[in-house]
From Swiss-Prot:
Role of this protein: Bifunctional enzyme with lysozyme/chitinase activity.
Coiled-coil residue spans: none
Organism listed in the record: Carica papaya (Papaya)
GO BP annotation list: chitin catabolic process; polysaccharide catabolic process
Reactions listed under catalytic activity: Random endo-hydrolysis of N-acetyl-beta-D-glucosaminide (1->4)-beta-linkages in chitin and chitodextrins; Hydrolysis of (1->4)-beta-linkages between N-acetylmuramic acid and N-acetyl-D-glucosamine residues in a peptidoglycan and between N-acetyl-D-glucosamine residues in chitodextrins
Location relative to the cell: Secreted, Extracellular space
Family named by the database record: Belongs to the glycosyl hydrolase 19 family. Chitinase class I subfamily.
GO molecular function (one): lysozyme activity
Protein name: Bifunctional chitinase/lysozyme
GO CC aspect terms: extracellular region
Length: 25
């Protein structure tokens, strides 16, 4: 459902933030 899509997107953002914290935001 949509909840899973949102959760996936948040997880993706977290991974990107961990890999490249300077580009957060």
């Amino acid at each position: 459902g949509i909840e899973k899509i949102i959760s996936r997107s948040m997880f993706d953002q977290m991974l990107k933030h961990r890999n490249n914290p300077a580009s957060f935001g």
